[in-house]
């Protein structure tokens, strides 16, 4: 069941979730869970608040949220249904139930992050995200090409890796796909969001060091040769992170856009 803590960010945060940041280079991230509702959106929010460019997706065939019984889920289409419309529908159906199980809090948070749930398999990598300028984390993601994809469970990782293989690497650009096994509930999603930011900070430090060595223009081009030294460091960085977060098993692979 997907729930969330309803944290919509501080009042000091800009509409797109990012404050003015003087710390320099930032890797670009993508977070992925099944329905683009709980874990990926918690990660999306936390990374945006940490001034990382970020987008998020789900890998399921449909958006599924808990209903009045286990056999009566609330089902919606990706890319066509806004978080606000889902919020209003559930509030009209049974406000007590959906407030008690955390769905209204979750959707209230989500609708200030971006318009609605997006499906990974429908996403055109590298397509400019000109209609997403109000999304939190949108600054720096205008070109629509992340450096790191973080999934929240193994089946989502499998879906992302398989989809990238099927796409045939048209951009010939490396992307690190990392799975963090996060249980789909309120508390673990919050913990997982903090863990994502910790990992992002560690990866970004390594990237900045390697970028300084090869030059900003070369590194930022995103080619395999220009980022080889950073790519080689990712497993070590992830291993050090795993020691700090032993309760969140991780998996990694280098894939291609």
Curated annotation (Swiss-Prot):
Membrane spanning stretches: none
Superkingdom classification of source: Eukaryota
Listed Pfam families: Ssu72
Gene Ontology biological-process annotations: intracellular phosphate ion homeostasis; mRNA 3'-end processing; positive regulation of telomere maintenance via semi-conservative replication; regulation of pericentric heterochromatin formation; regulation of siRNA-independent facultative heterochromatin formation; sno(s)RNA transcription; termination of RNA polymerase II transcription, exosome-dependent; termination of RNA polymerase II transcription, poly(A)-coupled
InterPro entries, sorted: RNA_pol_II_suA
Job of this protein: Component of the cleavage and polyadenylation factor (CPF) complex, which plays a key role in polyadenylation-dependent pre-mRNA 3'-end formation and cooperates with cleavage factors including the CFIA complex and NAB4/CFIB. SSU72 is required for 3'-end formation of snoRNAs.
Protein name: RNA polymerase II subunit A C-terminal domain phosphatase SSU72
Organism of origin: Chaetomium globosum (strain ATCC 6205 / CBS 148.51 / DSM 1962 / NBRC 6347 / NRRL 1970) (Soil fungus)
């Amino acid at each position: 069941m997907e729930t969330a803590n309803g944290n919509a960010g501080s009042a000091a945060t800009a509409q797109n979730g990012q404050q003015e940041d003087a710390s320099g280079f930032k890797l670009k991230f993508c977070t992925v869970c099944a329905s683009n509702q709980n874990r990926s959106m918690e990660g999306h929010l936390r990374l945006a608040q940490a001034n990382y460019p970020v987008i998020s997706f789900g890998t399921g065939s449909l958006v599924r949220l808990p209903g009045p019984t286990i056999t009566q889920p609330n089902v919606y289409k990706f890319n066509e249904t806004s978080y606000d419309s889902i919020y209003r529908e559930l509030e009209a159906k049974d406000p007590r139930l959906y407030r008690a199980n955390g769905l209204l809090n979750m959707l209230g948070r989500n609708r200030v992050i971006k318009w609605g749930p997006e499906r990974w398999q429908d996403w055109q990598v590298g397509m400019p995200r000109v209609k997403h300028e109000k999304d939190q984390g949108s600054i720096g993601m205008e070109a629509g090409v992340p450096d790191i994809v973080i999934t929240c469970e193994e089946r989502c990782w499998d879906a992302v890796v398989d989809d990238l293989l099927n796409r045939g690497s048209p951009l010939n650009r490396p992307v690190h796909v990392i799975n963090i096994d996060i249980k789909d509930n309120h508390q673990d999603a919050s913990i997982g969001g903090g863990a994502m930011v910790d990992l992002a900070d560690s990866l970004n430090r390594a990237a900045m060091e390697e970028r300084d060595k090869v030059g900003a223009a070369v590194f930022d081009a995103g080619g395999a040769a220009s980022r080889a030294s950073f790519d080689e460091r990712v497993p070590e960085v992830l291993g050090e992170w795993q020691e700090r977060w032993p309760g969140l098993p991780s998996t990694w692979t280098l894939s291609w856009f």
